[in-house]
From Swiss-Prot:
Active site positions: 71 (proton acceptor)
Main location: cytoplasm
Cofactor: a divalent metal cation
Protein name per the record: 7-methyl-GTP pyrophosphatase
GO CC entries: cytoplasm
GO biological process, one term: nucleotide metabolic process
Family: Belongs to the Maf family. YceF subfamily.
Amino acid sequence: MPQKQLILASTSKYRQELLSRLAYSYSAQAPLVDEEKEKDPSLAPQALAEKLADLKAASLKAADKVVIGGDQLVSFEGRIIGKAHTPERAIEQLMSMQGKTHDLITAICVYDGDKKIAYTDITRMHMKKMTRAQIERYVQLDNPIDCAGSYKIEKHGIMLFDKIESQDFTAIQGLPLIELGKILENANL
C-alpha cells in the first residue's frame, strides 16, 4: 500500500513550525475556503472554531491524503476576539482583556481519506492587570496583529499573563501536538 501524503491545510508559519516538531514529512497548502464568508455569528465560539477547522481540512481531503485543518479563536465575555490586523486595534483588544480571563479555543480536524477525527482544546488564559503603556510596549515588541487575541505566547506574550490553564501548551501556539501526535500515529503514515 503506498504511503499517504500528509497535508497541513494552512499557510500559517506558526502551525508549520509546530507540525515540524512531530517529525513527519508534510506539505502545507492553502485551504480552499473563504474563512470570512464561513464565519457564522450565530455559532458559539467553540462550534465556529470546529466548523472552520473542518472546512479547511475537508477542502483538501482525498483518499491518499491525511489532511490537518486547524482554527483558533479567543472567546471573551461572550464574543469572539479575532486577529487585530493593526497595532492600534491590538492595543484596544489587550486593554479590554487585561485583568480578566478568556478562553483560547484551538480546534483541529484531521481527514484520513474519508475518516474524520476532530479535537478541540480550550485553554483558560488569566491576563494580568496592565497599564496602557505596558500594553503599548508589548505590541511594539511582538507586533501581534496576525494572532487571535493579539498576543504571541511563544515570544514576549507570556509576560501578559498571571496564569495559564492548559492540557497542552502547544495548543496555545496553534496546534495541540499531544493529541495530534496520537491521531497521526494511528494514520499509518
